[in-house]
């Protein structure tokens, strides 16, 4: 629906309301409408489909998941015949794919764009969710599905006196549709996470001066950008369902099987050869998880990986002082970063690296930024400072469950869910890739989760039952997830994985770390035991 068509929502009665029109939201809409035949409408504050791929259109934006698994499998024709041009698709190509899926299945007619949901409250008397839009209109639905995104709630701290700056401040996840021309300009990029390194490598050769404002250096490996491999296309065409099941039957669903050999089990020369092969192949997740089994759990194994990356860094960066600034003593236990030619960027005469932990960003001036007491004159400041990941978008909606239970209050000490899909005391409420979902790539896992709760809703519909979650089952799931993170180096390395990147956010587990194959086994056992842990009645 267009903005004009989405007006007049007040009093709308639905079977299902879906918040979000990204990867998970589109498939949830398809399942509720086409599989179950329910009266369903979706709501998204964007003007089009895509979710995070609608908003994140900054220079260099692309997936760092193999395009082979960044796709739906429910439409076998598109799964086999969509012509990805690159091994790692650019944002524009991902968005084109999602629009093609939505158009083929006529999903947009059931989506209210430019519509923000501010509040969702369960009414026990009518057994309905009451949604309130930013315009004050109310919509009622028997089921509520939130597909609001893992990395969609951007975090961009404001430095003092920003209003004085005569240049332009751009927030990467809210990049203007009319792409600003950065050619020849003096640009600062604040942040060197996944977004930052993509922007830096993309614009370094185009801008006049590039100032990289780095707080925390991170280990970076090549991505391996190139044409979509024909052998991958052939494998999908041969048996698409077998390929999908092979991808899901893994730890992280990134299109490879995780390593089974300890990094400490090989002689140094053999270990180095394996790292070199992974380096030449590219992909951060592959380097971290496919090479060896214990990089994320053993400090000693982790050091073998960081020693190798450090040797590559030192060989690539000509200035030893800059190489030292790019080196971290932290474990290789954040979201793995990958970008082709990242370290080599710092050999360019127009690129300057600043350590803003030692010399903090103080404030804006008319001409730029004061960093460590020195003014840097700038035309553009790009904020690439990350996301309030996992929980951020859920908490932007005031969500009220049974008995007036407030989700934000319940999650004060950290999120609590069952299987990453439901919350005790919030009836007929489902999440796509909510907190305590598996630590994986997303599209195929979104599909799996939506299929799971579609079956649960179908079972409930037969008797018009309400679906809720037992507190004990939720507590047990949260404990399993907390124990799983505690056994990894992710637990003791500050990052968005454990919420440490957001001031005041609880530092806690937000993931099921047992891998997708184990997750499916756990959740299928629950289903086969009459949906043990769910309350259907």
Description of each model-found segment:
Residues 179-187:
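Glycine-rich NAD(P)-binding loop of Rossmann-like domains
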Residues 11-13, 167, 184:
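A glycine-biased structural micro-motif
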Residues 172-175:
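Active-site glycine-rich loop that binds ribose-phosphate moieties when present
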């Amino acid at each position: 629906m267009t903005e004009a068509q989405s007006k007049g929502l007040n009093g709308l009665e639905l079977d299902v309301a879906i918040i979000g029109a990204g990867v998970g939201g589109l498939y949830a809409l398809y399942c509720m409408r086409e599989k179950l035949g329910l009266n369903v409408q979706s709501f998204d504050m964007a003007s089009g489909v895509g979710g995070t791929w609608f908003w994140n259109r900054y220079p260099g934006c692309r997936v760092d998941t193999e395009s082979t698994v960044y796709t739906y499998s429910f439409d076998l024709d598109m799964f086999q015949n969509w012509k990805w041009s690159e091994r790692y698709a650019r944002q524009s190509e991902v968005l084109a794919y999602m629009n093609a899926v939505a158009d083929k299945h006529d999903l947009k007619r059931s989506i209210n764009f430019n519509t923000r949901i501010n509040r969702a409250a369960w009414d026990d008397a009518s057994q309905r969710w009451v949604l309130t839009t930013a315009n004050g209109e109310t919509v009622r639905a028997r089921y509520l599905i939130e597909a609001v995104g893992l990395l969609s709630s951007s975090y961009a701290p404001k430095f003092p006196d920003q209003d004085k700056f005569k240049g332009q401040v751009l927030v990467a996840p809210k990049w203007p549709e009319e792409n600003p021309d950065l050619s020849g300009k003096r640009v600062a990029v604040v942040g060197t996470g996944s977004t930052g390194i993509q922007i830096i490598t993309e614009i370094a050769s185009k801008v006049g001066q590039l100032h990289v404002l780095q707080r925390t250096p991170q280990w970076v490996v090549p991505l391996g950008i190139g044409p979509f491999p024909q052998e991958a296309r052939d494998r999908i065409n041969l048996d698409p369902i077998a390929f999908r099941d092979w991808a899901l039957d893994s730890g992280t669903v990134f299109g490879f099987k995780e390593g089974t050999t300890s990094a400490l089990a090989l002689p140094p020369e053999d270990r180095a050869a394996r790292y070199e092969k992974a380096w030449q192949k590219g992909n951060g997740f592959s380097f971290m998880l496919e090479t060896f089994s214990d990089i994320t759990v053993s400090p000693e194994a982790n050091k073998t990986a960081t020693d190798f990356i450090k040797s590559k860094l030192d060989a690539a960066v000509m200035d030893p002082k800059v190489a030292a600034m790019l080196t971290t003593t932290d474990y290789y236990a954040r979201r793995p970063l990958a970008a082709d030619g990242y370290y080599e960027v710092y050999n360019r005469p127009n690129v300057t690296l600043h350590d803003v932990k030692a010399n903090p960003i103080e404030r804006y001036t008319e001409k730029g930024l004061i960093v460590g007491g020195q003014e840097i004159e700038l035309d553009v400041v790009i904020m690439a400072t990350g996301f309030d990941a996992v929980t951020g978008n859920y908490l932007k909606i005031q969500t009220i469950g049974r008995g007036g239970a407030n989700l934000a209050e319940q999650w004060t000490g950290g999120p609590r869910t069952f299987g990453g899909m439901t919350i005790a005391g919030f009836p007929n409420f489902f999440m796509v890739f909510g907190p305590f979902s598996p630590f994986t790539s997303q599209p195929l896992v979104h599909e799996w989760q939506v299929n799971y709760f579609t079956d649960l809703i179908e079972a409930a519909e037969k008797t018009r039952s309400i679906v809720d979650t037992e507190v004990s089952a939720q507590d047990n799931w949260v404990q399993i997830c907390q124990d799983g993170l505690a056994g990894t180096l992710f637990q003791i390395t500050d990052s968005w994985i454990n919420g440490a990147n957001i001031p005041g956010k609880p530092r806690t587990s937000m993931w099921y770390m047992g891998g997708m194959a184990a997750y499916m086994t756990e959740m299928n056992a629950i289903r086969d035991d009459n949906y043990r842990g769910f309350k259907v009645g």
